[in-house]
């Protein structure tokens, strides 16, 4: 019941926004002489005076322990002290229960939507998850507040509330940013397409570095486009990055003290401009984050696999045996993950289409595994091993443009060593040599 009371109050506030805007527009349209113009101007000022009691704040939330929450969250807070309403505007609403959710997520077809609900519920949710919440109250004029409120109202309409989520380009953080910047005009000093020295991969490493397996999964799926330098505007795809830019944001226009929150004296940024953030406070204080305590890391697994591959290859050479079954296992184990990388080519997720790690975890291994093992079992050479050797060389060279997942280079080197040795062994094997002699003899006879 309490939730519906808050929602009803929020809807009532939106209705008042539209009514006051329409009244002001009608009065201003009848402004035909100077006396009436002055009178209507006063009416317009009085009609929007209630906006002085409205505070709009940027909410930045710390990371959680779930994989999807490692990177934090962004929302807006709309507080009307006169009406007693206090709501959170959240662009991160989604449902796991939607049909084919996992499949849709893999292919970048996940839909998120805007949600507006009581601020008390928002705080309770993040307090329960043990995540910090920082509030930055924004310094806005009445016109800007009105513009933001009307934009939120429009975005919350049934036909507009759902959007196609994109981790880098269109997420809860970028939505909140655009909602604010689109209504303050060209008055800012930051938020430009200024080149940086960072990349998308480096930025997410700052937040998943303590979660080695999550970082491995991200690095495995992200392609070479995640390693290009990004701009300052692209850098703001993460909640904490946007919060930092808001904290140093300067405004090139002068805002009168009467139009700022609580009539405080305008603060200035390091550049001498008036700051966009009026006040910063911690709703839920930050505390020590629980990090991954998994003793087994991806690199440890890669080293163990490399030792097994090299050890088996050496034993094979010393014993002069042909462990074709071991190669069958390797082809299947490296081919199955390759199916995921192949599927990423058709995904709508950004930066995953061109991924050179597919040359290491190659889905073609599943296609040629049977034919390759069949010929190896008979002691005959098969060209596919030589092809794999060249592909692995190319993959190692491509690390100039792409950072691979932890341990992938170690795996690639061990596989390359084995395939080179196997190709040489097949060339020198008696069965293969006898087959070559038989082919030559038959060719000469026909000739």
Regions found by a protein language model. Name each.
Residues 52-130:
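Glycine-rich catalytic cores of cysteine/serine-nucleophile enzymes that process amide/ester linkages
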Residues 28, 33, 40-50, 54-63:
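Early extracytoplasmic/domain-onset interaction patches
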Residues 27-30, 154-371, 376-381, 389-447:
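Activation targets extended, charge/polar-rich intrinsically disordered C-terminal tails
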Residues 64-65, 131-139, 158-167:
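Second-shell loop/turn segments in exported
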Residues 9-19:
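Bacterial N-terminal signal peptides
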Residues 21-25:
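Sec/Tat signal peptide C-region and signal peptidase I cleavage site
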Residues 1-6:
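Positively charged n-region of N-terminal signal peptides that target proteins for export
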């Amino acid at each position: 019941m309490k939730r519906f009371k808050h929602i009803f109050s929020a809807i009532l506030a939106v209705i008042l926004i539209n009514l006051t805007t329409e009244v002001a527009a009608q009065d201003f349209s009848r402004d035909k002489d100077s006396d009436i113009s002055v009178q209507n101007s006063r009416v317009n000022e009085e009609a929007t005076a209630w906006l002085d009691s409205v505070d709009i704040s940027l909410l930045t939330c710390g990371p959680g322990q779930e994989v999807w929450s490692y990177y934090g969250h962004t929302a807006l807070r709309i507080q009307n002290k006169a009406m007693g309403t206090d709501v959170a505007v959240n662009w991160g609403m989604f449902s796991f229960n939607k049909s084919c959710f996992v499949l849709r997520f893999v292919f970048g077809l996940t839909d998120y939507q805007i949600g507006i609900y009581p601020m008390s519920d928002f705080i309770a949710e993040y307090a329960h998850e043990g995540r910090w919440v920082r509030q930055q109250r924004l310094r806005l004029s009445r016109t800007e507040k009105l513009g933001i409120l009307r934009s939120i109202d429009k975005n919350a309409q049934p036909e507009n509330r759902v959007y196609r989520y994109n981790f880098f380009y269109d997420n809860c953080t970028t939505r909140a940013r655009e909602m604010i910047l689109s209504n303050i005009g060209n008055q800012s000093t930051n938020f430009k397409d200024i080149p940086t020295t960072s990349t998308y991969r480096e930025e997410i490493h700052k937040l998943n570095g303590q979660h080695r397996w999550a970082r491995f999964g991200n690095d495995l799926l992200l392609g070479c486009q995640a390693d290009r330098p990004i701009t300052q505007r692209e850098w703001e795809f993460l909640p904490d990055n946007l919060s930092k830019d808001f904290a140093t944001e300067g405004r090139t226009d002068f805002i009168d003290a009467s139009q700022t929150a609580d009539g405080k004296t305008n603060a200035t940024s390091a550049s001498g401009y008036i700051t966009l953030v009026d006040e910063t406070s911690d709703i839920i204080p930050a505390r020590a984050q629980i990090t991954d305590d998994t003793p087994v890391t991806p690199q440890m697994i890669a080293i163990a696999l490399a030792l097994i591959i090299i050890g088996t290859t050496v034993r094979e050479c010393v014993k002069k045996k042909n462990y074709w079954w071991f190669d069958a296992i390797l082809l299947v184990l490296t081919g199955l993950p390759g199916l995921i990388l192949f599927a990423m080519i058709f995904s709508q997720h950004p930066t995953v289409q061109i991924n050179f790690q597919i040359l290491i975890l190659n889905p073609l291994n599943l296609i040629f595994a049977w034919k390759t093992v069949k010929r190896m079992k008979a002691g005959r050479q098969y060209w596919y091993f030589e092809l794999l050797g060249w592909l692995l060389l190319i993959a190692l060279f491509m690390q100039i443009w792409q950072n691979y997942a932890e341990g992938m280079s170690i795996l690639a080197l061990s596989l390359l060593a084995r395939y080179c040795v196997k190709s040489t062994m097949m060339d020198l094997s008696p069965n293969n040599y006898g087959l070559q002699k038989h082919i030559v003899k038959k060719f000469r006879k026909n000739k």
